[in-house]
């Protein structure tokens, strides 16, 4: 039992050089918790509001108003509360905000405080964060979704699909999975370079070559997997994030890079064709965020054999997830803590998904920091999958390195999710 005696918010920079919120929480026993808040590039319309200052400073992206909320109204409301009362503290902040999307105080302000309090309480108890949040049952190391080719909003190239990922399901451990991913990543770099493509990386550490189509990108990845000594569709599978809301307008999916304009039925056919050709086991945001009929059609068509992940569709929001479950839409939720804006609501969304036999994928954002909280959350929730970028950029590797440490701490009790994540 330790009361909150001080909360300090500050403005720091994320991996894109934009301001974000960092919060320190100090407890009366001297324990300190620190958390930094991530930020997305392709954001769903239904996400909680990330409060930005506007004006000329930092081109409008400053977060001094959110910092003022942390140091002022939020501290006034929860200062003196016991840090072990996470749910009560989060609900107090949500009530203080008074809006459905946290647009008053800002989800970035509330989340920073929420996560820092959990870290402070874990420190007070002398427990690692994953153990404090997940209890004794927290032991599953997640299969990484490693984003090795970037397109869409994450890169300056003509590829429509935002992320091409590999999932090393046959690894014997998390550390082994990271090694396999690294080997494929470096093999892919050599293949791209030998074909005359640039090997610059995008926001999430994946390569951003000037490729002509989705299938060309997949072809390079398949070749890299094989040249690294692995078998696609056995050792390593593919996963895609279409971020299709970004190219959906007036009922049409406009794949500019490929010169295709498709209605919902055509988009479903497009995905079914790709899944038939390649070992793709997961597609995120295959349909636009409010194309519920398209999502239902996609789920009915390939949902029995492919993980269909709702990111912009669900935005880590229980109400939208409940709608999706009731409609039989998608079969998985992407979990981004800043989409909903508090630890309590994040954990509630994961619990709802699991109760409905939906999978959950813990995820970073394209604008990240050295904060590795999501690694602990992935293990705490036993969600079995994590999406945290490529094998480049320290803001991405911070999460993989933390998972390696957690696996070491768990010892023989730890279990790598591996092929248990496969459908069908």
UniProtKB/Swiss-Prot annotation:
Binding of (2R)-2-phosphoglycerate, residues: 162, 336, 365-366, 387
GO MF annotation list: magnesium ion binding; phosphopyruvate hydratase activity
Binding residues for Mg(2+): 241, 284, 311
GO biological process: glycolytic process
Provenance organism: Parvibaculum lavamentivorans (strain DS-1 / DSM 13023 / NCIMB 13966)
Required co-factors: Mg(2+)
Name of the molecule in the record: Enolase
Location within or outside the cell: Cytoplasm; Secreted; Cell surface
EC number of the protein: 4.2.1.11
